[in-house]
């Protein structure tokens, strides 16, 4: 860190590792380092070192290629970290997945009709992802397949494109097909987790 851009140009005592914890943002595209005094450093989802914003640090002054000062944005970032910790606590709770599943399936039952087959396409990796089949009916000569679980986690990188992400951050995907359902459903094994694997979002 350049001397002019740190609060401790002569160095400071080593941090106690037992007092440090990393908190990932819900989207998975940012992380905060927290100690007993609060935020120590944050690399948010909109940080891009190549564009001159490497992240924020409590010990930084002004802006440098290594870190921007955290003091001026602490009020904006701290609620995000609090939300993130609450989100991961919720995700670890035993009923979290069931609540997402129940909400999505109830919506599909009301809007499309009764379910058929149900597949796990997450391969054991988060976020948990299922596919629900709605077989053809007398008035609908095609099958509707829908993901179940994507909406349980916000998609990454929306903060780079819009100020209010609330209407775009959570999605489920669906398709209509006349192909055998178990063949068509395979696309969701790849595309369902794509936003978190590729650190992007659907809706560009």
What are the roles of these predicted feature ranges?
Residues 1-204:
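Short linear motifs embedded in intrinsically disordered, proline/glycine-rich low-complexity segments
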């Amino acid at each position: 860190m350049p001397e002019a851009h740190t609060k401790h140009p002569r160095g400071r005592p080593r941090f106690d590792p037992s007092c440090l914890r990393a908190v990932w943002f819900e989207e998975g595209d940012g992380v905060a380092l927290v100690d007993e005094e609060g935020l120590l450093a944050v690399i948010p989802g909109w940080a891009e070192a190549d564009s001159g914003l490497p992240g924020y640090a409590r010990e930084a002054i002004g802006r440098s290629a290594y870190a921007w000062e955290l003091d001026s944005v602490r009020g904006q970032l701290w609620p995000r970290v609090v939300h993130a910790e609450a989100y991961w606590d919720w995700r670890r709770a035993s009923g979290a997945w069931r609540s997402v599943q129940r909400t999505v399936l109830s919506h599909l039952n009301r809007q499309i009709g009764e379910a058929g087959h149900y597949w796990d396409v997450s391969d054991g990796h988060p976020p948990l992802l299922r596919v629900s089949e709605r077989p053809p009916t007398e008035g609908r000569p095609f099958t509707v397949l829908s993901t179940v679980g994507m909406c349980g986690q916000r998609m990454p990188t929306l903060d780079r494109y819009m100020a209010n992400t609330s209407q775009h951050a959570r999605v489920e995907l669906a398709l209509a097909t006349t192909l055998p359902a178990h063949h068509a459903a395979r696309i969701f094994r790849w595309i369902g987790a794509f936003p978190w694997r590729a650190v992007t979002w659907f809706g560009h």
